[in-house]
Each structure stands twice: as structure tokens, then as C-alpha cells.
Amino acid sequence: MNRHFNATRKIDPSRGATLGDGSPNDMNRVEIGPTQLAFAEWHTARLDLPDLAAMRRFRHRRLTDHVVARGYAGLLMFDPLNIRYATDSTNMQLWNTHNPFRATLLCADGYMVMWDYKNSPFLSEFNPLVREQRAGADLFYFDRGDKVDVAADVFANEVRILLRDHAPGLRRLAVDKVMLHGLRALQAQGFEIMDGEEVTEKARSVKGPDEIRAMRCASHACEVAVRKMEDFARSKVGDGVTCENDIWAILHSENVRRGGEWIETRLLASGPRSNPWFQECGPRVCQRNEIISFDTDLVGAYGICTDISRSWWIGDQKPRADMIYAMQHGVEHIRTNMEMLKPGVMIPELSANTHVLDAKFQKQKYGCLMHGVGLCDEWPLVAYPDHAVAGAYDYPLEPGMTLCVEALISEEGGDFSIKLEDQVLITEDGYENLTKYPFDPALMGVE
């Protein structure tokens, strides 16, 4: 009997040429993305998938509109997350953060060019909005040695020619994060360098419909991973072996299993190591009848950041009264502040009208009471009143913005910290809390 097979091996044999998000149903594709595990969990949760092509067009239009509105010739991006936003392509993202070998130029007419690692120009070819792939933006000393200035001149000349053709007569160029020789070379070409980060942060602040669908999916995947981490912690803590790193490793593993990418921080601490906050997770063996607090800072499926925080009580005894009070105070803080969120409210109003933490928690409170979120922690930042800078954030909230609402309840000299954080979408008439993960009932005083 003859058996016939399609030349392309499918990721999901039950589907046609594309998966539910419009990406190729090809086992050997270049494009990264969610795994079948994630898709199955999202199907069970009845989540709508994003249309990735539509999401990419929305982002491209947002950036282009912001460039045109400022009268700029173009936007030159070196930051790997700005490049991800513009092109939806990745290449050694963490290595790229300290070895900036990639660049993307978005011209005022929408023409977009990618400079990539010389051996991997194919990594953005799946996106038709990227019109050209080139190499030569690696303007750092490790790669260029004492001739980095020569490489910078060649690169800057390419930028000049592209903008001559696609933004004739315009000489103001927005640049986000550029190496010193790159900056000098661009200025030598006659460009007036403008703040590209101001452009990208504001463009990224409002999410389109498919970005919101992607965030819902990413948030679900993150919360499933957090549940796996909690189950592990509750079953293992007290065995005399399990340490903070063992617990944190579960979140990493479960994130990657669902197509997630990395975690920005190491913010999990147990017992007295949770105070002061910002101690990174380490080899401390976790004990029963202690608090474990963490902040996900997780870049997950579709490159979307899910930034939520929780504190758990793990043990057979009841938590102390001061722990329960701190937890309840933190929940009140984020819930009260969340109620202020709606389109049109000015960011300074949020600062001025914040729920006030008890005096004993003021010194060690979190660095902000809210911040934007998308591909990572993003603009805007909502400061506490004593840290607010007049004129820094005089902008209204808009529908489609997503914010993380924070609480750190931590007394100086104490032996624990409560860390809480929910991720919220600004809707047309208010807000929607995207975070479904429950608060620990023992710390809430209901167990």
C-alpha cells in the first residue's frame, strides 16, 4: 500500500496551513511562538487568539503615525524590545541587550529595514512589513575593535541614503539607544537626533485589539505557570532541601514550555529574606510557616509581559496577626487605587489621590504605585506623591492602555514583606482586571 505525506510536517495535524493565530502550521518554521500545550490550555479557557498579521500592522501603523506626527524623517531603533514591537522578530534577545547588533529603521513613509546578525538575515523574513534585511549595525567594541568608527560611518551613510529616498527633505531622526560612535556618525551625516524612546514608549502604550488578545493568552499561560510553582512549593517546602531557586525554576520551566521567552528579574524571596524587598532568589532552603513573596516580571507567549506579584503562606500554622493585617492592607491598596482607573483621568491625579499606606510602611513602599506594561514594564509610570516630579507625566489615560497596580507592604526592620500586583486594561468606560490569580486565603485571614 502506498502512503502519501504532505511535504510540510504540521505542528497541528488537525488544522490547515495556519494555526489559530494565523502563523504557519509548519513544524520547521523559523518563527517562534506558543506551543501546542499553550494552545490547548487557551482553547479550554475559551480565549480568543490574536491575529498576528493584524497585530503587526497595528504596531507598524502606530509607530509610523507617531513619526509623521512629529515631522521626523524616521525612527532608528536598537533596543531589542522596540525592534520586537516594530517587526515581531527576535534574535538572541538577552545577548542583544548588551551587544546591540540589531537595528531597525522605520522611515516616515512606512518603509522598514532591518539590520541583523550577518549569519541570520532570515529571522525577520516572515514579516512582509520588513522590506529589507541587511547587516552592519553592530557598533560595539567586541565586534569592531579599534575600527568601530569606520563601521559606524558605513552604517550611518546607509541610513542617510534610505531617508533621502523615503523621507526627502527631512533631517530630524529619532533614535532610541545608540552606541557612542553610532551617534557621532549619524550627526556627521547631518541628522538632528531626537528622542526615539519618547516615540516608542508612547506608541507602545496603547494596545490594539489583537495585542489585547495576545495579552489575555499570555496572562493565562503565566498564571498556569504560577499555579505549577505554587503547587510545587506547597508540596516541597519543609523537606530540608527545597530552596528558593528550586521554586523559581518551576516558573521558568513552565513559561518556556508554553512558548514564553524569559524572566526579567529574580524576585522571589522567602521568610526574612523578603525584607527588605529586592533580594534576588538564591540558595536559601525554605522553611515551613513562612511567607514566600515573588514578582513574575515574565516575558511570555508572543513576547508579552505578565507582571503580577503574590505572597503565599506555606505551613500548617496560622500566619501572625501582623502578617494578615499587612496582606489585607496591601489588597486594599491595590483595589482602592484600581478604582481610580478610567479613560481621561490624568496621571498626576492618580498620584495625588492614591490610597495612603500606613506610616510604618512608607519608607519601604514600592518605587511606584502603577506602571505601564506590554512587552516589558513600559511608560507611563505613576509615582507616589512624595516621588512625583511635576510635569513628567502630564498625560491622560486612554482606552487600550495596560497598567500594573502595585503594593509592597514592608516595615523597616521587619521579618517579611507582602508583594502584590495585578495587571489591568483601561477600557472605554473604566478598567478590567486581567489578573485572575487568587490571593492567599491564609494571609487574607479567611482560613
UniProtKB/Swiss-Prot annotation:
The EC number(s) given in the record are 4.4.1.3
Q: Which cofactor does it need?
A: a divalent metal cation
* Residues binding a divalent metal cation 2: 307, 371, 406, 421
Q: Which UniProt keywords apply?
A: Hydrolase, Iron, Lyase, Metal-binding
InterPro entries membership: Creatin/AminoP/Spt16_N, Creatinase/aminopeptidase-like, DddP, Pept_M24, Peptidase_M24B
Which ranges form a coiled coil? none
The UniProt annotation places a divalent metal cation 1 binding at: 295, 297, 307, 421
Q: Name one GO molecular function term.
A: dimethylpropiothetin dethiomethylase activity
Q: Which SUPFAM superfamilies match?
A: Creatinase/aminopeptidase
At the top level, the lineage of the source is Bacteria
State the free-text cofactor note.
Binds 2 divalent metal cation ions per subunit. Fe(2+), which is the most abundant metal ion found in the X-ray structure, may constitute the physiological cofactor.
Q: Is the keyword Transit peptide assigned to this protein? A: no
* Catalysed reactions listed for this entry: S,S-dimethyl-beta-propiothetin = acrylate + dimethyl sulfide + H(+)
What's the subunit arrangement here? Answer: Homodimer.
Family per UniProt?
A: Belongs to the peptidase M24B family.
The protein's name is: Dimethylsulfoniopropionate lyase DddP
Organism (species): Roseobacter denitrificans (strain ATCC 33942 / OCh 114) (Erythrobacter sp. (strain OCh 114))
